Amino acid sequence: MSDALLNAGRQTLMLELQEASRLPERLGDDFVRAANIIIHCEGKVIVSGIGKSGHIGKKIAATLASTGTPAFFVHPAEALHGDLGMIESRDVMLFISYSGGAKELDLIIPRLEDKSVALLAMTGKPHSPLGRAAKAVLDISVEREACPMHLAPTSSTVNTLMMGDALAMAVMQARGFNEEDFARSHPAGALGARLLNNVHHLMRQGDAIPQVMLATSVMDAMLELSRTGLGLVAVCDEQHVVKGVFTDGDLRRWLVGGGALTTPVSEAMTPNGITLQAQSRAIDAKELLMKRKITAAPVVDENGKLTGAINLQDFYQAGII
């Protein structure tokens, strides 16, 4: 029984891969035309399709939207019952139908022509009514479905998804869409956390900032170290400009060397220690701490004045790993 299941699964994958392997050679003028129509679209891309094509269409619309192309999915039945009103002349419709003869097209195509909406087709029948009406046809045809009965859309839905990805990625690259653009549309994701957060978004502020003045004694600096638990204290002048840092390591070295606790901390600190700019990207700041093998640092403004403090745990808690 297990061998039969494994063989069926492997056969399905092999058939789907075989059909998908034919897609690259089909990309030509129509693919370029479709991509350019989307690139120059001043409105939105509306993706539509019925059944399994509709399910894949939702994914294609989501991929376009998350990679810099305003897009959404409209079900053909809903389009014919009012949602066509959302479609304007500056929009583009990408209709997915393997047969290219969905009955809804008989009503949708004339309405699109009335509105001068550019129609793109993704179909297995390029010479179907859908293919003939479209400005560009993306051929997703297969010689056979992976379904043993040749009925359930399998190879054809894989081809549809792959063609949609190919189109979305080509448009994305042509737009110059980059990681930061992607992060802006995914602010709650890991990439958004990595690229959108600056140090000032994550740093500790107010009473949570460990700080002392240059004339503060080593004893009082030690108490400040203990109070905040960050492993360092920022040592500032009277204008709150950071002049150095006093760390747990500095304290140990001072005591081992016989230093007095009444001595000003300015004599025991590390002068000109690492500081982070409040406006710098959090991911860059975290990588700097890792590179220098330190766990925390004061945060300063453009004038070097203390505005906060941050440690590696603050980055990790924000999802910046």
Swiss-Prot record:
One of its GO terms (biological process) is keto-3-deoxy-D-manno-octulosonic acid biosynthetic process. Residues 34-177 form the SIS domain. Zn(2+) binds at residue 75. Substrate binds at residues 68-69, 75, 81, 107-116, 141-143, 267. Keywords: ATP-binding, CBS domain, Isomerase, Lipopolysaccharide biosynthesis, Metal-binding, Nucleotide-binding, Repeat, Zinc. ATP binds at residues 49-54. Residues 203-261, 269-321 form the CBS domain. Its EC number is 5.3.1.13. Gene3D superfamilies: CBS-domain, Glucose-6-phosphate isomerase like protein, domain 1. It comes from the Bacteria. InterPro entries: CBS_dom (IPR000644), CBS_dom_sf (IPR046342), GutQ/KpsF_isomerases (IPR050986), KdsD/KpsF-type (IPR004800), SIS_dom (IPR001347), SIS_dom_sf (IPR046348), SIS_Kpsf (IPR035474). GO terms for molecular function: arabinose-5-phosphate isomerase activity; ATP binding; metal ion binding. Signal peptide: none annotated. It catalyses: D-arabinose 5-phosphate = D-ribulose 5-phosphate. Transmembrane segments: none annotated. The record marks 52, 104, 145, 186 as: Catalytically relevant. The keyword Methyltransferase does not apply. Catalyzes the reversible aldol-ketol isomerization between D-ribulose 5-phosphate (Ru5P) and D-arabinose 5-phosphate (A5P). It is also able of sustaining the biosynthetic pathway of 3-deoxy-D-manno-octulosonate (KDO), a unique 8-carbon sugar component of lipopolysaccharides (LPSs). Belongs to the SIS family. GutQ/KpsF subfamily. Homotetramer. This is Arabinose 5-phosphate isomerase GutQ. It comes from Salmonella typhi. The gene is gutQ.
